[in-house]
Regions:
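N-terminal active-site segment of His-dependent metallophosphoesterases
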Residues: 1-60
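Active-site-proximal beta-strand elements of phosphoester/diester hydrolases
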Residues: 7-20, 106-116, 148-152
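Active-site neighborhood of phospho(di)ester-bond hydrolases with catalytic His/Asp-centered motifs
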Residues: 12-14, 42-48, 72-78, 148-152, ...
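Solvent-exposed loop/turn segments at secondary-structure junctions
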Residues: 16-19, 49-52, 78-82, 115-118, ...
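Extended active-site neighborhood of metal-dependent phosphoesterases/phosphodiesterases
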Residues: 55-144, 164-173
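Short acidic, glycine-rich surface-loop motifs adjacent to enzyme active sites
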Residues: 140-157
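Long, structured stretches of catalytic cores involved in phosphate-ester chemistry, encompassing
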Residues: 156-180
Length: 180
């Protein structure tokens, strides 16, 4: 018989809401020390890195996270989108993208932006991101790989096109949608 191990160790951070000098900044520095000494292979940050999502705050968090000794994968939350395309452009300029995909031996990790595009609006995944999700999963989900999908919002409660998202994901072996 097969002796496949599906174990993977990683750290997940979310809603850290760092503003220069606030308590969350201190807590993040402590978390980084812990992560650097634990057996996590990588770190995922699933949104709300900052309070206001200003360029200054985003650069500050990026600088702090530069102390991590492990790869980090980041998606924005509603505090980074600040409910505008220009804020999202700043996020992409600083972090390189608002989505990620990578594989380990047995998993495909995929993170997608589902930020609102109107102040206080529901979360929404853009059509082109749903298409990207479909293409990435179709090409990567081979040999029994399981999908770990990361997004900022609880899917059914706060995502206006959650059914479109589920329609893509349900074709694959999923572990979870959202940690709440």
């Amino acid at each position: 018989g097969s002796n496949l191990s599906y174990g993977v160790n990683f750290s997940l951070l979310s809603d850290i809401h760092v503003t220069p000098g606030n308590e969350n900044e201190t807590q993040l520095l402590k978390a980084i020390e812990e992560i650097n000494t634990n057996d996590s292979e990588f770190v995922i940050l699933s949104g709300d890195l900052t309070n206001e999502g200003s360029d200054q705050q985003l650069y500050n968090v990026k600088k702090i996270l530069g102390n991590l000794d492990k790869p980090i994968y980041v998606i924005p939350g509603n505090h980074e989108d600040t409910w505008s395309q220009s804020a999202l452009k700043s996020f992409n300029d600083i972090w390189g993208n608002d989505r990620f995909v990578f594989e380990t031996d047995n998993y495909v990790f995929i993170g997608i932006n589902c930020g609102p595009y109107m102040k206080m609006g529901d979360g929404h995944i853009k059509h082109e991101d749903l298409r990207w999700l479909e293409l990435e999963l179709a090409s990567r989900c081979t040999d029994g790989k399981r999908v770990i999908s990361i997004n900022h919002y609880p899917i059914k409660d706060d995502l206006d096109n959650w059914q479109d998202y589920i329609n893509v994901l349900q074709k694959y072996l999923l572990l979870f949608y959202h940690i709440k």
